[in-house]
């Protein structure tokens, strides 16, 4: 049966499912359960997968017609100059035509000379039919590269002017800290009415394979290859990768008058014969083919010589490589949105690469888990370990088990098998899924993971149809969907006892610092109303979660808020060395029953400690107290800790100030990321055993040792929020918004996750915020919809190309109502014997997510320099393997990138320049530790915008336009001093105002008459009744709604001292900390590749 031919039956189970009203939505999936029935799952909304009789039953491969056409002599071989994804559009986002620019001479291993290559003229191609040879020759004659001034391009191309050089940032940041104390914008409190917080999971289209000079179905022309010789008398000897800043030191300039001369390389042939050893491959994604790679060749820019000695003086200075002639992230993102943002992504085809995370798309579940739950670095896995080692592409999956879905998508269905529980394989314990193969008339099933034959219980038996599929397959979510939930039996519960509903305990620092800043009063006022919005399940009128309160400085104060009391009672525990809970009855209470007593307590706390002079605090005993309270109540739960200073009081977990910037760039730098004492890891282990998750809100005025304090939240599945130099007037909205969201979001407690794989691969490494007591089980005291677990796989046997590879993620957790559940996600991947299929089906955003987490964990045990070198080497090996095995023969002067990895260099450079791996002088040790633990559990969407921020021009699109303005590349070159730009990276939000912006725009946005009157550092825009003001404020609200944390606004004026902070996020430019520009890093990467190939 063809996968695209089946007609779905009528949905038999379209009834509403249990749902959860939490933060912004009433279920894990984000759909509003109170007003509308559950949306039928994907199998009923489109073609059903045609399960065939050969295993795996669930996902069949697509028919040959859906694959890419096999390579032929009429096609451009991989690596050949052809059209790419550079569409005709805004010039500031990259070339729209195949413009050739110069680059630095190719590198030489050990400085050996390189023979000059032949002449290769540039090609300028517009859209349209393929040009004739005569047309090409005409276009070539109109452009020259090596002269000082290039003539205008021919009329058939785009008429953009000569390239400008990349500007490098200079100056210094203000002392306020990168992630701390900028003024805060105002935003309304979160409410249920706001709906789902605008998760935009954008998509990516797979570009089509195309013949030489033939435009594909979509996308713009591709860059031609470019080659060039070394400068006379110059060798390309650069620093080894082991030097501290790969290309981070400022490049040495050539002597005045140096000129790049020599002929350009030969034009690649229009049609190249199939190279030996490279077999024609069908596209492994069984969708649109992911076409040939882009070529970027030619001489490197002359400025970055990477430490080589200047050659003899030459006449004119050379032009540097045009930034517009290299791959543009913005263009790739826009192309994917245009090509894949209009149609739903149907998960019925095995190994299908999903749209990019930057594309907004809908998902129809037809047997594989949605990419919102699982994204892989590659959807086509090498069949052998030798092939995987050769390619060096990490095989990993980023799993977000409780991901929130947009309202248009249904939450996973809940399946109840009663006392018998979910059906599993007897040998490997995998759960029933669409890939299981039923045999012997339905009386047995063969496990798709371990091939064990299992009996089908009588109560689960059903007959098979003529294709070998059960006739009730579409009545059962576990037989037709990629994601679903089982209600767990008592066998899945601790001590064979069903759990109690969880509890929230608020633990408030009442030392001098917390009182002085107004934090305690602000928090107590907010909690009065916030307790009405605790997460609840289904149609429940009130939350089942109980609450408790503790305040502390050097000692701890517990509060009895039993509903029968007229006033709350305080009990003080001063023996912090041996912590215990002084009361059980009345500590954890139902909010509605004890509302009057709780309100009275929250009114009294700020007054009781108003005159305190106690500056010392404890930390470990506070968490111990919360954990003991949960243990006494026999329930799981979450601690909300509000803490202001380094815990220096005499108590377990006492810390000293060890901040030492002199350790940066030394072998001891790793100690700055390690906890000071083992007491915190021991405490975290105890918390996980109890199901006690910790969320930490920090309000430091100075060093607090985030690396140590964040250990417990990190290992328990919690979160850390940091508000440096907290001031109520500037930071209240950000803190309250984060707090509301954190309290309201749905959480799974006391969770255990296991990832099973089919024979041939296994999970070997895990990254994220969790604890592992063995090598297979990920233990999480708490897991919310923002957290991910990244899993790396390795081969332990040969894979079969026909049967593919399977993953199953099973999460056992306790819901907010105390119900024990199993959430299952399944994914089928293709397997390949050709490297070209691997490179054609990679996902660069997921690859960068994995590489960043790998590096950020590496700094705990290795010098930062070694970690950075490892990343550079791995990237070079990935691209060199592609060049050697998949690209058509071409000059060594060409840089050839795989089509779906052409953004790998720019994104990897952003990771290398990040504050954790290459800090500027203004980045504090706490900031680095904070960002390190944040990235560890980020999903692919978050790492994408964190490492490559979005830069949006505000005055170029019509004021009446309701769509988001098109982004521009993150470089100072792209800024116009007559415009205003918004920049966001998921944590920070800047509004940059050009010095020449029109007076009317200034008046409309800031209600002042001139640029000079704008207040730099402003954190709230005035609310003005005009279209531009409404549009900008609406856009800011929209961006904030898309992110998991509130982004505070900072207004930055051009040439103001705050501008250096803004320029830190223009990641295509050189950084103040010595990080390379995108252009320079691409040149350096080319040098590394050539060294590997030679």
Swiss-Prot record:
COPII is composed of at least five proteins: the Sec23/24 complex, the Sec13/31 complex and Sar1. Interacts with TMED2 and TMED10. Interacts with GOSR2 (via IxM motif) and STX5 (via IxM motif); recruits GOSR2 and STX5 into COPII-coated vesicles. Interacts with DDHD1. Interacts with STING1; promoting STING1 translocation to the COPII vesicles. Residues 425-450 are annotated as: Zinc finger-like. The gene is SEC24C. Component of the coat protein complex II (COPII) which promotes the formation of transport vesicles from the endoplasmic reticulum (ER). The coat has two main functions, the physical deformation of the endoplasmic reticulum membrane into vesicles and the selection of cargo molecules for their transport to the Golgi complex. Plays a central role in cargo selection within the COPII complex and together with SEC24D may have a different specificity compared to SEC24A and SEC24B. May more specifically package GPI-anchored proteins through the cargo receptor TMED10. The keyword Protein transport applies. Belongs to the SEC23/SEC24 family. SEC24 subfamily. Residues 20-29, 60-77, 273-282 have a biased composition (Low complexity). InterPro entries: ADF-H/Gelsolin-like_dom_sf (IPR029006), Gelsolin-like_dom (IPR007123), Gelsolin-like_dom_sf (IPR036180), Sec23/24_helical_dom (IPR006900), Sec23/24_helical_dom_sf (IPR036175), Sec23/24_trunk_dom (IPR006896), Sec23_24_beta_S (IPR012990), SEC23_SEC24_subfamily (IPR050550). Ubiquitous. The keyword DNA damage does not apply. It is found in: Cytoplasmic vesicle, COPII-coated vesicle membrane; Endoplasmic reticulum membrane; Cytoplasm, Cytosol. The modification Phosphothreonine is found at residue 214. Residues 90-101, 133-144, 165-175, 189-215, 240-251 have a biased composition (Polar residues). This is Protein transport protein Sec24C. GO terms for molecular function: SNARE binding; zinc ion binding.
């Amino acid at each position: 049966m063809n996968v695209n031919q089946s007609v779905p039956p009528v949905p038999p189970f379209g009834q509403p499912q249990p749902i959860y009203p939490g933060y912004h939505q009433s279920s894990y999936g984000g759909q509003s359960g109170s007003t509308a029935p559950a949306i039928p799952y994907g199998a009923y909304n489109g073609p059903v997968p045609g399960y065939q009789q050969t295993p795996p039953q669930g996902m069949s491969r697509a028919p040959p017609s859906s694959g890419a056409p096999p390579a032929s002599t009429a096609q451009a071989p991989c690596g050949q100059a052809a059209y790419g994804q550079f569409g005709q559009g805004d010039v500031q986002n990259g070339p729209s035509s195949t413009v050739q620019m110069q680059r630095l001479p190719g590198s030489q291993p050990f400085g050996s000379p390189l023979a000059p290559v032949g002449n290769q003229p540039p090609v300028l191609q517009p859209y349209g039919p393929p040009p004739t040879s005569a047309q090409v020759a005409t276009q070539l004659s109109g452009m020259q590269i090596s002269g000082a001034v290039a003539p205008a391009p021919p009329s058939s191309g785009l008429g953009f002017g000569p390239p400008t050089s990349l500007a490098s940032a200079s100056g210094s940041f203000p002392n306020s800290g990168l992630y701390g104390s900028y003024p805060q914008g105002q935003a309304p409190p979160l409410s249920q009415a706001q709906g789902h917080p605008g998760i935009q999971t954008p998509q990516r289209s797979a570009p089509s394979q195309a013949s030489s000079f033939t435009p594909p179905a979509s996308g713009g022309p591709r860059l031609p290859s470019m080659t060039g010789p070394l400068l006379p008398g110059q060798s390309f000897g650069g620093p080894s990768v082991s030097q501290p800043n790969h290309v981070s030191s400022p490049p040495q300039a050539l002597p005045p008058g140096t000129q790049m001369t020599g002929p350009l390389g030969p034009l690649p042939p229009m049609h190249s014969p199939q190279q030996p050893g490279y077999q024609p491959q069908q596209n492994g994604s069984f969708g649109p083919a992911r076409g040939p790679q882009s070529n970027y060749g030619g001489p490197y820019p002359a400025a970055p010589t990477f430490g080589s000695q200047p050659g003899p003086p030459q006449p004119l200075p050379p032009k540097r490589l045009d930034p517009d002639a290299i791959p543009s992230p913005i263009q790739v993102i826009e192309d994917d949105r245009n090509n894949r943002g209009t149609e739903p992504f149907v998960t019925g085809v095995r190994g299908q690469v999903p749209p990019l995370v930057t594309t907004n798309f809908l998902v129809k579940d037809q047997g594989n888990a949605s990419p919102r739950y699982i994204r892989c670095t590659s959807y086509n896995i090498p069949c052998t370990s030798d092939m995987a080692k050769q390619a060096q592409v990490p095989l990993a999956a980023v799993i977000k088990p409780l991901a929130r879905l947009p309202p248009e998508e249904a939450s996973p269905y809940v399946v109840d098998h009663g006392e018998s529980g979910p059906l599993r394989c007897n040998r490997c314990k995998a759960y029933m899924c669409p890939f299981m193969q039923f045999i012997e008339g339905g009386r047995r099933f063969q496990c798709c993971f371990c091939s064990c034959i299992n009996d089908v219980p009588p109560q689960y038996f059903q007959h098979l149809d003529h294709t070998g599929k059960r006739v009730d397959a579409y009545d059962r979510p576990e037989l037709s969907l990629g994601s679903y939930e089982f209600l767990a039996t008592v066998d899945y519960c601790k001590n064979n006892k069903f759990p109690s509903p969880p509890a929230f305990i608020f633990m408030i620092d009442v030392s001098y610092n917390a009182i002085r800043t107004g934090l305690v009063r602000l928090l107590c006022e907010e909690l009065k109303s916030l307790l009405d919005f605790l997460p609840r399940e289904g149609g429940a009128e009130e939350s089942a979660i109980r609450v408790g309160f503790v305040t502390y400085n050097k000692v701890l104060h517990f509060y009895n808020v039993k509903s029968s009391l007229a006033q709350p009672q305080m009990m003080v525990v001063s023996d912090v060395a041996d912590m215990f809970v002084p009361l059980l009855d009345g500590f954890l209470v139902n909010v509605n029953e004890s509302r009057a007593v709780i309100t009275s307590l929250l009114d009294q706390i700020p007054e009781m400690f108003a005159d305190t002079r106690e500056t010392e605090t404890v930390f470990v005993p506070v968490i111990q107290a919360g954990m003991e309270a949960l243990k006494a109540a026999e329930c799981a739960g979450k601690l909300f800790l509000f803490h202001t200073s380094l815990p220096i009081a005499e108590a377990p977990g006492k810390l000293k100030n060890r901040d030492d910037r002199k350790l940066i760039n030394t072998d001891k730098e790793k100690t700055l990321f390690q906890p000071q004492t083992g007491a915190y890891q021991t405490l975290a282990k105890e918390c996980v055993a109890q199901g006690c998750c910790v969320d930490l809100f920090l309000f430091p005025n100075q060093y607090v040792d985030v690396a140590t304090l964040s250990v417990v939240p990190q290992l328990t599945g919690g979160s850390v929020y940091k508000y440096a130099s907290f001031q109520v007037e500037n930071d209240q909205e950000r803190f309250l918004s984060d707090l509301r969201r954190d309290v309201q979001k749905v959480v799974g407690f006391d969770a255990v996750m296991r990832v099973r794989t089919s024979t041939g691969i296994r999970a070997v490494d895990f990254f994220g915020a969790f604890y592992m007591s063995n090598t297979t089980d990920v233990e999480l005291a708490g897991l919310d919809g923002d957290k991910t677990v990244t899993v790396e796989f390795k081969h332990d046997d040969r894979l079969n190309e026909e049967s593919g590879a399977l993953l199953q993620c099973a999460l056992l957790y306790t819901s907010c109502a105390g119900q024990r559940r199993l959430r299952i996600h399944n994914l089928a991947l293709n397997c390949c014997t050709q490297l070209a299929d691997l490179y054609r089906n990679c996902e660069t955003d997921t690859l960068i997510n994995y590489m960043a987490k790998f590096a950020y964990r590496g700094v705990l045990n290795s010098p930062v320099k070694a970690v950075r070198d490892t990343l550079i080497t791995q990237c070079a090996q990935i691209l060199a393997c592609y060049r050697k095995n998949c690209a058509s023969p071409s000059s060594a002067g060409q840089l050839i990138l795989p089509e779906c990895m052409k953004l790998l260099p720019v994104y990897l450079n952003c990771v290398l320049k990040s504050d954790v791996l290459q800090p500027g002088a203004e980045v504090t040790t706490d900031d680095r530790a904070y960002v390190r633990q944040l990235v560890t559990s980020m999903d692919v969407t978050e790492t994408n915008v964190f490492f490559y921020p979005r830069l949006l021009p505000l005055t170029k699109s019509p004021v009446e336009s309701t769509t988001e303005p098109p982004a521009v590349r993150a470089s100072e070159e792209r800024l116009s001093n007559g415009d205003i730009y918004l920049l966001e990276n998921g944590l920070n939000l800047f509004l940059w105002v050009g010095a020449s912006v029109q007076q009317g725009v200034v008046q409309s946005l800031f209600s002042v008459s001139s640029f000079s009157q704008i207040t730099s550092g402003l954190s709230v825009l005035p609310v003005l009744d005009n279209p531009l003001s409404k549009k900008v404020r609406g856009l800011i609200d929209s961006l904030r709604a898309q992110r998991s944390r509130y982004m505070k606004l900072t207004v930055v004026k051009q040439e103001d001292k705050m501008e250096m902070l803004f320029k830190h996020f223009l990641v295509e430019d050189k950084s103040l900390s010595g990080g390379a520009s995108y252009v320079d890093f691409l040149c350096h990467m080319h040098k590394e590749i050539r060294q590997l190939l030679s």
